[in-house]
Amino acid sequence: MKIAIIGGGASGIIAAITAKRLNKNIEIDIFDANKSIGKKILASGNGRCNISNTTISSKNYLGESPTFVDFALKEFDFKAFLKFCKTIGLLLDIKENGKVYPLSNEAKSVTNLFSLALEELNVNIFCEHFVQKVEKKDDKFIIYANDKEFKSYDKVLISSGLAAAPQLNATEIGLEIASSFGHTFNPTYPSLVGLQTKETYKGKLQGVKKECSVGLYINGSFEQEILGDVLFTAYGVSGFAILDISQRAVLALTQFYDVELRVNFFPKTSINDLANQIQTLFKNLPKQKAVDILTGLISNKIAPILLEICKIDINTKADDINTKQIKSIAHQLNSWRLKVVDTQGFSHAEASGGGVKTSEVDNKTFESKLIKNLFFAGEVLDIVGNRGGYNLHFAWASGYLVGKNLITDK
């Protein structure tokens, strides 16, 4: 039996290892566009590789049907992943927040050990091979790569991901191949990505970073709230809180909804207490400019913009600020509104949303419901996880199940 795996990422790698361990007589070829496999693994977690998470459920995923992941997460939960990692010599560092990293704290350890496992099992790896199309003739799949017909195969796994990180040769060739076999897909979009905002003053806030709570409002209705770092940039906002909230925000943008963020700079302080603090500051320094006094509370980049939004002259002294204006300042700091107009795109995204419709794929085997012996795994499917190791774990879990089912003759 000959098997082709299109994409040497997490799901493709673990599928190959699993299948070969179960049947050493099969021949497996992995095709990857890069000079070496696992490039996205190397880039994950800022080079540290947030490889998994100890607490995982369908609640950590978005897509056409998030519960599609339930069977895979049950069959290949964190304990199963931990056991698998030990078989290739990969030791893990489990953090208190549930995030999991290689004990070496380097993503390179992950790719090295998986590569050694593939080599030991005699899996063929064809790097810098750009798969352009797949055809089915009789019961065989024909792979075309680098402008020529390559080989024929009994089974094919599409684990090529989507367009996130095009600098790593990420493309949507998997969707093109799926479409050629009659599959449909939901539109793709960047996920876990910085957000561009409409406000004209945004460049003046570049570099400001603070822990905040961020509320997401879609068409004026509250959707979600996230606590975490917010980084103001020349284009808008980034930081962990923004990456987390971007998933639902970007999905709403693709549906042409109005998307607004409301940033609370002091999430642990009530609006009344904040107003009292500001009033006390102004009372203690009545002859100083309000804008200068506010820098004891908030960044000196934010203070002048804050007064401008509250329609208070920047040269106004503290004792000239009335109670109504103080409440206005406190309210603005409690609910700073930003209109989201776009994202930073796939080149800055950690993941992609959208993809092959999961309703067309068996959730237990990950085989196509339309084409026998055609399989899908990982990001190419319309499943995207939250930040924190969830996307990589779905890649491992889906690839593992594919590996088990690639060896069966049905």
Which residues does each predicted region cover?
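Glycine-rich FAD pyrophosphate-binding loop
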Residues: 4, 20-46
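Glycine-rich loop(s) and the adjacent beta-strand/alpha-helix scaffold that form part
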Residues: 155-201
